[in-house]
Amino acid sequence: MINRTILVGRLTRDPELRYTNGGAAVATFTIAVNRQFTNQNGEREADFISCVIWRKAAENFANFTHKGSLVGIDGRIQTRNYENQQGVRVYVTEVVVENFSLLESRAESERHQAANGGSGNNNYNNGNSNYNNNNNGYSNQGQNAAPQQSSANNNNPFGNGNTGNASSAAPSSSANNNNQADPFANNGDQIDISDDDLPF
């Protein structure tokens, strides 16, 4: 059985970082994902998907993202339920994030934030950061969230800045040392890609 979710979209609000009674960090946020088709008015509609991320990855996510940030999310869908203070059973469906990537540069993110009048967090790692969240699940009964242990997962479908043929595309000069975080910084050079490597 497969339960895998990959999303690319923008945050609808700043991530909300909290800590469980056991001291584990947990951040919740909502990501807006545009649909692939347009409605009758020619506009693209969006789906708003609730997400949760745990531990150190949650702290990193909260520190490096803000409302409007473009992110890639890799995780799984989870449905849980709890009884609220009024005694009503509440069902929640959300994506438990295992990996994420920041998909825009610091300058683009700041430009987007300024255009929207936001005042989020400005701590970035040049737009090429990838984070793994090794928590594969949790149970949450109201305020007493308790993380479950799981094996480490280092698979990242969004890649990291050091994979692929980026090294063959970069010149061997001192400028290369300054651009290691951005494999596409030397955009004037040719890139050796065969037709078999292209997804279309």
Swiss-Prot record:
<keyword id="KW-0233">DNA recombination</keyword>
<dbReference type="GO" id="GO:0006260">
    <property type="term" value="P:DNA replication"/>
</dbReference>
<feature type="region of interest" description="Disordered">
    <location>
        <begin position="108"/>
        <end position="200"/>
    </location>
</feature>
<protein>
    <recommendedName>
        <fullName>Single-stranded DNA-binding protein</fullName>
    </recommendedName>
</protein>
<dbReference type="InterPro" id="IPR000424">
    <property type="entry name" value="Primosome_PriB/ssb"/>
</dbReference>
<keyword id="KW-0235">DNA replication</keyword>
<comment type="subunit">
    <text>Homotetramer.</text>
</comment>
<keyword id="KW-0234">DNA repair</keyword>
<feature type="short sequence motif" description="Important for interaction with partner proteins">
    <location>
        <begin position="195"/>
        <end position="200"/>
    </location>
</feature>
<dbReference type="Pfam" id="PF00436">
    <property type="entry name" value="SSB"/>
</dbReference>
<dbReference type="GO" id="GO:0003697">
    <property type="term" value="F:single-stranded DNA binding"/>
</dbReference>
<keyword id="KW-0227">DNA damage</keyword>
<dbReference type="GO" id="GO:0009295">
    <property type="term" value="C:nucleoid"/>
</dbReference>
<feature type="compositionally biased region" description="Low complexity">
    <location>
        <begin position="121"/>
        <end position="187"/>
    </location>
</feature>
<dbReference type="InterPro" id="IPR011344">
    <property type="entry name" value="ssDNA-bd"/>
</dbReference>
<dbReference type="GO" id="GO:0006310">
    <property type="term" value="P:DNA recombination"/>
</dbReference>
<dbReference type="GO" id="GO:0006281">
    <property type="term" value="P:DNA repair"/>
</dbReference>
<comment type="function">
    <text>Plays an important role in DNA replication, recombination and repair. Binds to ssDNA and to an array of partner proteins to recruit them to their sites of action during DNA metabolism.</text>
</comment>
<feature type="domain" description="SSB">
    <location>
        <begin position="1"/>
        <end position="104"/>
    </location>
</feature>
<dbReference type="InterPro" id="IPR012340">
    <property type="entry name" value="NA-bd_OB-fold"/>
</dbReference>
<keyword id="KW-0238">DNA-binding</keyword>
